[in-house]
Amino acid sequence: MANNIKLSILTPQKTFYVGDVKEIITRTVEGEIGILPNHTDLVAFLTPTETILVEEDGSRKKVFTSTGILNVGESEVSFMCDASEWPDEIDIQRAETAKERAEKRLKTSNNIDVKRAELSLSRALARIKTKND
């Protein structure tokens, strides 16, 4: 039995993170999920969220993860997501502006793409939470 999980977080632009962790807490379309070593195999769709990585020494790292796919194997986990950022990489003003813009679009009924606006709002809120927590 492995005591750690080999984690990879990949975005279209780069390999964002590769390392060993003890636990991962994230959110899928089905809800929040905690992943420990020897977790049941799983493939799930990710939603924008603050993901928590618990390192070998018990310390916690926060990371923003966007929409994508989560692949869980016995001792390996892969995030393949549109974007991923550490809290210090998040432009809080840009996230606040995106939040306000999405909220305005959702309040108007002028032929908007509601799903797109909801997703924009979700991404902005997750970035803000990751930066401010």
From Swiss-Prot:
- What is the similarity comment for this entry? Belongs to the ATPase epsilon chain family.
Q: Which residues form a coiled coil?
A: none
Source organism per UniProt: Clostridium acetobutylicum (strain ATCC 824 / DSM 792 / JCM 1419 / IAM 19013 / LMG 5710 / NBRC 13948 / NRRL B-527 / VKM B-1787 / 2291 / W)
Molecular function (GO) terms listed?
ATP binding; proton-transporting ATP synthase activity, rotational mechanism
**Record keywords, A-Z:** ATP synthesis, Cell membrane, CF(1), Hydrogen ion transport, Ion transport, Membrane, Transport
Q: Which InterPro entries does the record match to this protein?
A: ATP_F1_dsu/esu_C_sf, ATP_synth_F1_dsu/esu, ATP_synth_F1_dsu/esu_N, ATP_synth_F1_esu_C, ATPsynth_dsu/esu_N
Protein localization? Cell membrane
HAMAP family from the UniProt entry: ATP_synth_epsil_bac (MF_00530)
Give the UniProt entry's GO cellular component terms.
plasma membrane; proton-transporting ATP synthase complex
Query: What is the recorded membrane topology of this protein?
Result: Peripheral membrane protein
**In which domain of life is the source organism classified?**
Bacteria
Role: Produces ATP from ADP in the presence of a proton gradient across the membrane.
Give the quaternary structure: F-type ATPases have 2 components, CF(1) - the catalytic core - and CF(0) - the membrane proton channel. CF(1) has five subunits: alpha(3), beta(3), gamma(1), delta(1), epsilon(1). CF(0) has three main subunits: a, b and c.
What is the gene name? atpC
Q: Return the protein name.
A: ATP synthase epsilon chain
